Amino acid sequence: MSYLAVSSFSLHKALGPLRLEMRREDGTLDDLLIDFPRTLTFEEFIGQARDTVGVKAVELCQLQFDSAVPERIEHLRAALDEAGMRMLTMPIDIGDLGHVNAAWRADDEARIKNWFTIAKQLGASYVRVNAGSPGSVVTQDAWAGLVASLRSLGDAANSMGLRLLVENHGGTSSSPEFLLPLQAAVGLDRLGILLDLGNFDPLVGISHARFTNTDVEDTGIDLEPMYAAIARLAPHATLIHAKSVDPARDGTPLPDLPRALSIVAASGYTGSISIEWEGRLGDPWERTCAIAATVRQQFPHLQ
């Protein structure tokens, strides 16, 4: 069964700090928090996604968890069950599997696998990791290590009844010429592709700049390569992120979501789609509902 889901990142302005990390040259890890107020709990988000958007599934992002202690996870699973909702995906944003340091990668793998256990406890179908770190460039000398790490994680996910995904998430990973050979090297049985309809240059750079309140030129840009990349990856996608951000100053939609979704539909895709509103303007629930209506026009079969 295929679902329309809402990502918790769509409510990033309300669900509290984003918890990232940075590894120093000596290997120690520092927490990196992007501060947002917590005016909504995960439990409240789940209920509102059902009642406001009319979906039956959610995506809960690891970097938005306020706690991962067993009692917290049990309470969250109970909230999902009570609401009649399922957790579709857990995007996991820790580690750098594209680093050449094997010991660091091994540590990252172990910590990622701990989140696999949490995802399984919450009933997730998919876990998404990064092919490197978001926006990074994976060098040729890091390729073998990245493939080995993803094979290990893919086997671990399979053993838990989960499906491992990587996403076009900026940098090298936003190139089909990188993602498709990577999937082939890791093995289609171990690794799927999460196609994010907005995470291609130049849009991913615009989105990240806005997120850090950096002024960036967003008018007159050529988005045709982005739609070509969507067409290249859509036949290989396991899951879709219906991404949308605030329009350009001249009103150009970023992206043209009906066009992007029509490309996906033309590829024969019939799987699940998760809504990810990444804009800063307007009411996020209203924006998410608008995206949901657009998705359902192209994919009316989604639960």
Q: Model-found features: residue ranges?
A:
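N-terminal pre-domain/capping segments
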Residues: 1-121, 188, 192, 209, ...
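Active-site-proximal loop/turn and secondary-structure-junction residues that shape catalytic pockets
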Residues: 10-12, 62-64, 93-96, 131-135, ...
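Acidic/histidine-rich catalytic cores of soluble enzymes
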Residues: 18-20, 57-58, 90, 150-262
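Aromatic/hydrophobic pocket-lining residues that form the small-molecule binding cavity
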Residues: 42, 73, 108-115, 143-146, ...
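A structural motif
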Residues: 54-55, 119, 124, 237, ...
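A short helix->loop->beta-strand "cap" motif at the edges of active sites that frequently abuts
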Residues: 85, 162, 267-271
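Active-site groove signature of glycoside hydrolases
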Residues: 119-139, 160, 165-173
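Short acidic/histidine-rich active-site segments
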Residues: 272-280
